[in-house]
């Protein structure tokens, strides 16, 4: 359990190019954003609040007893939306906030707790996040699976869509065998292992409010990974290594049907 109280904020944007109206998509009788909030409510959070960009999301949350605030519809990112939510909620600068994505209806409550606990455990970190060991070469080479390399203290060196860390002397399956051997030889040093980044974040509210004012990083623009902005500007990101694979998120109609099947079984 976390060593300090924390608030879960769930960004919810009605428009989606691949799945219009995604936050309100029905999953076994409940809007998806309500499902996410209910899962987050099983964590140790003192409160869970949806940061919505449309009145229809706020109304759906209210109908199911979920707290929500209405934010501007012109935010460029979920982080910008949560920064406004911090202001609307009057959070103090040292308050811990966990960003749970609004398309993760199967997120594990204990993962939320673990990511929230990173900041009290690692005072030098501005952000916390999570990662899981990659178990296939296909995932390692898939640009839609974001990788992270960590140092011996569990801080992120870099995030990339490319296969990192790269073994210069090997390729393909030979690389995979070399990486597995290196990870086994140094189990206390997660930087040797290929790790999949999980898109959950913790911040102190003061840092979250300042994040939109940081200039975008060239690496962030190149990789389309917003967390690289923090590293570019010298901030540290602590990484929780979880032994459990993350539950499936919902980005496409096919993803939605898979999650519906799991929750209706």
UniProtKB/Swiss-Prot annotation:
SUPFAM superfamilies: Nucleotide-diphospho-sugar transferases. Keywords: Cytoplasm, Lipopolysaccharide biosynthesis, Nucleotidyltransferase, Transferase. It is found in: Cytoplasm. Its main location: cytoplasm. It is an enzyme of class 2 (transferase). The keyword Aminoacyl-tRNA synthetase does not apply. It holds the Pfam family CTP_transf_3. GO terms for cellular component: cytosol. It comes from the Bacteria. Pathway: Nucleotide-sugar biosynthesis; CMP-3-deoxy-D-manno-octulosonate biosynthesis; CMP-3-deoxy-D-manno-octulosonate from 3-deoxy-D-manno-octulosonate and CTP: step 1/1; Bacterial outer membrane biogenesis; lipopolysaccharide biosynthesis. GO terms for biological process: CMP-keto-3-deoxy-D-manno-octulosonic acid biosynthetic process; lipopolysaccharide biosynthetic process. Its EC number is 2.7.7.38. It catalyses: 3-deoxy-alpha-D-manno-oct-2-ulosonate + CTP = CMP-3-deoxy-beta-D-manno-octulosonate + diphosphate. GO terms for molecular function: 3-deoxy-manno-octulosonate cytidylyltransferase activity. InterPro entries: Cytidylyl_trans, KdsB, Nucleotide-diphossugar_trans. Activates KDO (a required 8-carbon sugar) for incorporation into bacterial lipopolysaccharide in Gram-negative bacteria. Belongs to the KdsB family. This is 3-deoxy-manno-octulosonate cytidylyltransferase. The gene is kdsB.
